Amino acid sequence: MTPFGEAVRKLRARKGVSQKEMAAALNVTPAYLSALEHGKRGTPTFDLLQRIAGYFNIIWDEAEELFLLARFSDPRIVVDTSGLAPEYTAFVNRLAARIRNLDAVTIGELSMVLENAGKRG
């Protein structure tokens, strides 16, 4: 499950609706909504994100967070390292090869490193 999928599932639970009910209201298939929640589809379109925010009648801050989660929830991300130094390509490939074996603590630590690196540059 992706961060976006988890957020949508929580919103559905809070509203007390099934995937089938939500899918009908959004004019998508229940299978598509299920795949979106489970990270088996790419990121939703901006139009669908707006419909989801409207369906749950969420405030702007919560909608903005949902949009951000969607942006970081593509389960099949491609990292383009063309034009970068060889060590960047090697790093991305090592991460891809080992990501399934990393525990939550290590993921948290790596996330903090990335967050702090963004503040420096």
For every predicted segment, state its role:
Residues M1-R14, R98, E109:
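A short, Lys/Arg-rich alpha-helix, primarily the initiator
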Residues V8, R12, M22-A23, L33-L36:
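Conserved hydrophobic/aromatic packing and binding residues within compact polymer-binding modules
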Residues N27-T43, R51:
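Recognition helix of helix-turn-helix/homeodomain-like DNA-binding domains
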Residues D47-E65:
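DNA major-groove recognition helix of helix-turn-helix/homeodomain DNA-binding modules
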Residues E64-A97:
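Short, charged recognition helix plus adjacent turn
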Residues R100-G121:
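Mid-protein regulatory/catalytic core that forms ligand/cofactor-binding pockets
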